[in-house]
Structures are given as C-alpha cells and as structure tokens.
C-alpha cells in the first residue's frame, strides 16, 4: 500500500531490501514517490503488476506480505502464483474479511499458520496470519476464529466476537418466534462464539 510497509521495515532494520507491487497506476506512482522521498530507491523496487506477478523466483524473495483486501481475494492471488511460492519461506497475510475461507485455502494447499495477531483500529478489527509451508489440520472453529487467536484470547479478539454476539442477539430479536429454523441458526452461531469466549449463556 504505497510502499509504506517496506519503507517502515527498512527504517527499523528488519529487512534488507524489498519489492513493492502495485496493481493500479495511481498507488504505483505514489509508492515510487514515497520510496524516493525516503531515499530508499536502492533498497526498494516498485513494480506495476498484479499480485505475485510482481516478482520472479530469481528475485529470491523470502517473505511475502499481502494486506488490506478480502480473504478470498488473497487466496485467489496465492492460487494464481502458487508455483512461485516454493522457495518463499513465510507469508504474512492480513485479510479484511472471510478469514475462515483464507485459512481453509491455506490448509488445503499445505500451508500452516504458525502465528496470528488481531488489532483494533477505528472500531474495525484486523487479523494477521503468519504462514509457512507444511501440513496442518484445523477444526471448523479454528478455521473461523483462528487457532492461535482462540487460544490467546487477546482483548481485541474478545471485543470483536463480543460485538458479533451483540449483533446476532439483535438479529434474533427481530426474527418471529414461529420462524424456528432461522432462530435456531442464529442461536447456534451465538452459542459457538460464547463457547470460544468461555462465556456462559
């Protein structure tokens, strides 16, 4: 996103070099300008390309970050460039939604989630997945809530799913009593969340 992340990582001494890929001309030009403004043209190469087309195996990339888009789109990007990931040791993924679909794709393509984080900003919640190659099996709950996030129960995680319970409770109040199937579906979703949060009914 405008090369902000590689610029920050270089300034903090966490990486040695980076390729910043942008698919749209405007952000591409913005990224070029930001890199130049920080005097990092020799460390960050900005490329106009779609997804993993921004790099080649000869670039010897060890870590790829894809952030700020839906989980399904991230999975599509990874699928389109799957053959390029053989020598990439780590993925850092930040889906804005459909986190469960992304986790399912990763498991089905022999990737394992080694760590997760969640943060809240401006009343929005963002989950971050750190992924490496390797087999992993996840339960349906782990796919939805995140295996590490479930275990760690960070304040932002509890806040996110507590808000979801509030939304579902409100939706349940709007469903007529005679509509048992809809009510049962909502009640089941509420129960699953409360079980993960260790909250009694």
Tell me what each language-model feature is:
Residues 54-59, 63, 72-201:
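Class I S-adenosyl-L-methionine
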Residues 2-16:
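Conserved SAM-binding loop of SAM-dependent methyltransferases across substrates and taxa
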Residues 1, 69-72:
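Short glycine-rich anion-binding loops that position phosphate/pyrophosphate groups of nucleotides
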Residues 21-62:
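S-adenosyl-L-methionine
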Residues 17, 43-45, 112:
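Conserved beta-strand segments of alpha/beta enzyme cores
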Residues 19, 45, 90-92:
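A structural signal for isolated positions on well-ordered beta-strands in alpha/beta enzyme cores
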Residues 5-9, 31, 44, 74-78, ...:
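Hydrophobic packing residues within well-ordered alpha-helices of enzyme cores
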Residues 12-14, 36-41, 83-86:
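Short helix-capping segments at alpha-helix termini
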């Amino acid at each position: 996103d405008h090369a902000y992340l590689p610029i920050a990582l270089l300034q903090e001494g966490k990486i040695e070099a980076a390729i910043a890929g942008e698919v749209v001309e405007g952000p591409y030009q913005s990224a070029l300008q930001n890199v130049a403004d920080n005097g990092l043209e020799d460390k960050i190469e900005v490329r106009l390309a779609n997804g993993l087309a921004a790099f080649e195996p000869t670039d010897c990339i060890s870590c790829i970050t894809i952030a700020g888009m839906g989980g399904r789109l991230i999975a599509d990007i990874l699928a389109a460039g799957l053959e390029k990931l053989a020598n990439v040791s780590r993925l850092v993924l930040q889906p804005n939604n459909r986190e469960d679909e992304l986790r399912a794709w990763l498991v089905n393509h022999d990737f394992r989630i080694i760590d997760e984080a969640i943060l809240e900003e401006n009343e929005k919640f963002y989950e971050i997945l750190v992924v490496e190659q390797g087999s992993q099996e996840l339960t349906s709950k782990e796919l939805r809530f995140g295996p590490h996030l479930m275990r760690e129960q960070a304040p932002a995680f509890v806040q996110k799913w507590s808000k979801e319970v509030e939304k579902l409770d409100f939706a349940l109040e709007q469903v007529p009593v005679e509509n048992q199937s809809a009510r049962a579906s909502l009640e089941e979703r509420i129960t699953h969340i409360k079980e993960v949060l260790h909250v009694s009914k």
